[in-house]
């Protein structure tokens, strides 16, 4: 067989022509040590702070420390398979998570990946986990109400859209209950809710999901879960994942509500990361930038100016205290960042006052300007009346000889405390809250025993729903009590008084 030179050269030419010239270039480094979700990597000289890294097995990591001869990275996922000497690639991207309408009704992990077994999330939109909060020019003062459906909050500690209101209290005082009721109360409205569970038991998260489904609230809610069994880096990043999803709605001119449950556990996870990264510890072994950890997160919740779409992102961070100590390190940090706090007290909770809000220590610094006018009219003196009642009740324990005025004030105070109680998962619309507080302030409930007031309230709502729906509609539309509406309410309450028997 004869081999001709032309044929050989033709074959070589053809192969050169068809040769693929694409060469994938990636900057890689080598793991020099790994443990507890932290890897030290040599060779990634050009890595950026917060950059996404690619570990073997498709696991992601995030650069946190940039040192002279190595970088410290948090591994965002299961790290048991990763070992010393493995190769790590740079991606050149900052950590991103999926955002958009497709996430509504889903349960996702701290990286935005679905964990509810309902298949993949179809979205092509992504948002950076760490972005700068809107500047002063892009903001507007809070002026629209964010109704929680809880009488004690909407009347005395009102929350506005774009506000950051802290919910603080010991364990088992109903902090999550307040947050879940607020989500349920947004049903039929235009608010998208995001619930971020940080370091909680999986059973607790499952319970929250089933309660929200039961009340039809998952139709407008996203749940981000970094449970107790997940590595510290995921617990640390989950609030930022949640707020990134919320910012998408805020910047689209919509309204969103985000709940962080709770930020104490995020601070603990961040402390663990920082100590493993050998950053110097400060007070209570927290790193020096633990204030910035929370401030940069909460500053991203705001009311945006009309020029930027007039959207809003309202934040309800939760902080757990130890034995009611509000002056500990993390609680004081978050109190100073937020626009007010709702303080829940275990003594009140165990004495049957639920929601267990301590009116004296709870405050809303900007919500007053967002409160519905009708509520402002009826609830203006409520806080003062309750404070006077508490003071009077303390004195009344010492002596039994009380004059008639004092006895009346004590009786009125007892009734006010009773009508502000509310069962869980039963938010009350604003116009009905106005009715019951109006009735209490104007002496319509003074003649009834305290034990009959729960029934009085239920029957009053039914009476107005069935026979005085026009009064409720007027209150809902006008959002204020003028002489005409006041006359109608008084007449209706007098009519109801004749029918109601204690």
From Swiss-Prot:
It comes from the Bacteria. One of its GO terms (molecular function) is ADP binding. It is a peripheral membrane protein. The keyword Nuclease does not apply. The record marks 362 as: Required for activity. InterPro entries: ATP_synth_asu-like_sf, ATP_synth_asu_C, ATP_synth_asu_C_sf, ATP_synth_F1_a_nt-bd_dom, ATP_synth_F1_asu, ATPase_a/bsu_AS, ATPase_F1/V1/A1_a/bsu_N, ATPase_F1/V1/A1_a/bsu_N_sf. It is an enzyme of class 7 (translocase). Its EC number is 7.1.2.2. ATP binds at residues 169-176. The keyword Transcription does not apply. Keywords: ATP synthesis, ATP-binding, Cell inner membrane, Cell membrane, CF(1), Hydrogen ion transport, Ion transport, Membrane, Nucleotide-binding, Translocase, Transport. SUPFAM superfamilies: C-terminal domain of alpha and beta subunits of F1 ATP synthase, N-terminal domain of alpha and beta subunits of F1 ATP synthase, P-loop containing nucleoside triphosphate hydrolases. It catalyses: ATP + H2O + 4 H(+)(in) = ADP + phosphate + 5 H(+)(out). It is found in: Cell inner membrane. GO terms for cellular component: plasma membrane; proton-transporting ATP synthase complex. F-type ATPases have 2 components, CF(1) - the catalytic core - and CF(0) - the membrane proton channel. CF(1) has five subunits: alpha(3), beta(3), gamma(1), delta(1), epsilon(1). CF(0) has three main subunits: a(1), b(2) and c(9-12). The alpha and beta chains form an alternating ring which encloses part of the gamma chain. CF(1) is attached to CF(0) by a central stalk formed by the gamma and epsilon chains, while a peripheral stalk is formed by the delta and b chains. Produces ATP from ADP in the presence of a proton gradient across the membrane. The alpha chain is a regulatory subunit. PANTHER family: ATP SYNTHASE SUBUNIT ALPHA, MITOCHONDRIAL (PTHR48082:SF2). Belongs to the ATPase alpha/beta chains family. This is ATP synthase subunit alpha. It comes from Geotalea uraniireducens (strain Rf4). The gene is atpA.
């Amino acid at each position: 067989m004869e081999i001709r030179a032309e044929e050989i050269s033709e074959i070589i030419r053809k192969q050169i022509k068809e040769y693929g010239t694409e060469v994938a270039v990636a900057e890689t480094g080598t793991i020099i040590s790994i443990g507890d979700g932290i890897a030290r990597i040599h060779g990634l000289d050009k890595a950026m702070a917060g950059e996404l890294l690619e570990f073997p097995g498709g696991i992601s990591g995030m650069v946190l420390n940039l040192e002279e001869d190595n970088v410290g990275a948090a591994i965002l996922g299961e790290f048991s398979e990763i070992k010393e000497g493995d190769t790590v690639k740079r991606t050149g991207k900052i950590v991103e998570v999926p955002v958009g309408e497709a996430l509504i009704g889903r349960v996702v992990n701290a990286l935005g990946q679905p964990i509810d077994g309902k298949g993949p999330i179809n979205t092509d939109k992504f948002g950076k986990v760490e972005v700068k909060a809107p500047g002063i020019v892009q903001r507007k003062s809070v002026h629209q109400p964010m109704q929680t459906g809880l009488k004690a909050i909407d009347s005395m500690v009102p929350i506005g859209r774009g506000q950051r209101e802290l919910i603080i209290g010991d364990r088992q005082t109903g902090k999550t209950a307040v947050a879940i009721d607020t989500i349920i109360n947004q049903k039929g409205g235009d608010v998208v809710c995001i619930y971020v569970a940080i370091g909680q038991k999986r059973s607790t998260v499952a319970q929250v999901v089933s309660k929200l489904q039961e009340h039809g609230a998952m139709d407008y809610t996203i749940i981000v879960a970094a449970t107790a069994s997940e590595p510290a880096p995921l617990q640390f990043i989950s609030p930022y994942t949640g707020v990134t999803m919320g910012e998408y709605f805020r910047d689209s001119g919509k309204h969103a509500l985000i709940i962080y449950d709770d930020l104490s556990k995020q601070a603990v996870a961040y402390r663990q990361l920082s100590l493993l990264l050998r950053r110097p510890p400060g007070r209570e072994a927290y790193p020096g930038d633990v204030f910035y950890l929370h401030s940069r997160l909460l500053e991203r919740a705001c009311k945006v100016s009309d020029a930027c779409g007039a959207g809003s992102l309202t934040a309800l961070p939760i902080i757990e205290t130890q034995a009611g100590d509000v002056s500990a390190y993390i609680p004081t940090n978050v109190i100073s960042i937020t626009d007010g706090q709702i303080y829940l007290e275990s003594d009140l909770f165990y004495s049957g006052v639920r929601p267990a809000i301590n009116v004296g220590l709870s405050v809303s610094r900007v919500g007053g300007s967002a409160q519905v006018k009708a509520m402002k009219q009826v609830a203006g003196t409520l806080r003062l009346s309750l404070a006077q009642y508490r003071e009077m009740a303390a004195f009344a324990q010492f002596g039994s000889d009380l004059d008639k005025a004092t006895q009346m004030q004590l009786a009125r105070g007892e009734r006010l405390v009773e009508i502000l109680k509310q069962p869980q998962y039963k938010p009350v619309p604003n116009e009905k809250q106005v009715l019951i507080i109006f009735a209490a302030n104007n002496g319509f409930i003074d003649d009834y025993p305290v034990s009959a007031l729960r029934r009085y309230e239920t029957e009053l709502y039914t009476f107005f729903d069935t026979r005085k729906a026009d009064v409720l509609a007027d209150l809902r539309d006008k959002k204020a009590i003028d002489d005409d509406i006041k006359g109608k309410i008084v007449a209706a309450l007098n009519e109801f008084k004749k029918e109601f028997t204690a």
